[in-house]
Structures are given as C-alpha cells and as structure tokens.
C-alpha cells in the first residue's frame, strides 16, 4: 500500500494474504493442523520480504505509539484493533489495490469486499472482540498517541498514499475505541 510498493513486493504480499485468509483460521483453531501452520509460516516469511522490499504503512506507526505507552499491548493486537478504521480511512487513496487484496482473500474485489473479509478473518480467529480499554488505552491520550506516531515513525506517513494528519489519526483511534 505504500508509495514505494513494487511488483515484486505486490507478488509476495498477495500470495501471503491468500495464505493467511485461507490458513490462519485453521491454524488458530487447531494448532495440530501442520499444513495450516506451514502456510502461515510461509505467509509470515513472504510478509517479511514485503516489508523489506516495499515497506509498510503508517498503521504500524500508530500502533507503535500505542504500545510505547502500553508495553503489555502486543503489536498484533494493536494492529487488529485499529485495522478497520485505519483501512476505511486509507482505502479511498488506492481502491484498486484494496480490490486486489480483497480478491486474494477470496472476497468481492472492492474496498467493501476487503473490509468484509477483514472482519470475517478477525471473527474466524477469535480476535474481533479485542478492546483498547482492556490494555489501558484511554481516549484522553489520543492526541498524545497521534503526536508520538508522527514524531517517532513519521517516515511511514510520508510513504503513505493517503496523507493522514494527526487529526486523522485521532479519528481512527476514536472509531477503534472500545
């Protein structure tokens, strides 16, 4: 999704997304499913290639700000909790890329298809009910989280196709809060 995405990065990303959509729920719900675990591991490896080749988006900057203030918050849990609001805000900047991701997830090739697929994946893995409040995150610090996201990892915002502002980050956090 970053502006420095490349065909090679896209190739690995789309394959990783396909494997995650298909195999992650199986691996989460049955740890003995070695086929599912192998494909999740491969998807994880491909994702590492993508971060090296094409970087990542400011969603990671926002989450790192959250976990900096709340060290018990796992990075993945933070990403999950902000994912829907983040991608809803980001998607208008590159709907065709989201359509490709949705198709890789086996969903309708559209932004809505992606958002629906994201929700289905979260539900299938039992992480759709994560709450920011359970990790000590409170709305009174949303402005501080936004400032921290920009001051510590602002380079990712510069690589975004969607030019988010600190106010946009606060809005994403507000929509994600429970």
Which residues does each predicted region cover?
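Active-site pocket-lining segment
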Residues: 72-134
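Glycine-rich phosphate/pyrophosphate-binding beta-alpha loops
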Residues: 45-76, 154-156
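General structural signal for alpha-helix termini and helix-helix connectors
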Residues: 2-3, 26-30, 46-49, 68, ...
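Carboxylate- and glycine-rich phosphate/diphosphate-binding segment that chelates Mg2+/Mn2+
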Residues: 1-54, 161
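Alpha-helix N-cap/helix-start motif at coil-to-helix transitions, marked by capping-box chemistry
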Residues: 7-18, 56, 77, 92, ...
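Alpha-helical scaffold segments in soluble metabolic enzymes
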Residues: 15-26, 39-42, 46, 61-68, ...
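C-terminal charged capping/lid subdomain of soluble metabolic enzymes
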Residues: 108-178
């Amino acid at each position: 999704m970053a502006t420095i995405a490349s065909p090679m990065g896209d190739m690995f990303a789309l394959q990783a997304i396909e494997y995650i959509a298909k195999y992650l729920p199986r691996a989460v719900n049955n740890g003995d499913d070695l086929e599912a675990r192998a494909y999740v591991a491969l998807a994880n490896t491909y994702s590492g290639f993508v971060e090296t080749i094409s970087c990542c988006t400011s969603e990671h900057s926002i989450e790192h700000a959250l976990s900096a203030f709340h060290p018990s918050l796992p990075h993945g849990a933070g990403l999950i909790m902000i994912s829907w609001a983040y991608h809803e805000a980001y998607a208008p900047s590159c709907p065709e890329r989201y359509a490709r991701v949705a198709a890789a997830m086996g969903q309708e090739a559209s932004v809505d298809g992606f958002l629906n697929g994201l929700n289905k994946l979260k539900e299938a893995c039992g992480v759709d009910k994560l709450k920011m409040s359970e990790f000590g995150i409170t709305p009174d610090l949303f402005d501080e989280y936004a400032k921290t996201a920009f001051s510590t990892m602002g380079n990712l915002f510069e690589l975004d196709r969607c030019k988010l502002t600190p106010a946009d980050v606060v809005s994403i956090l507000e929509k994600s809060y429970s």
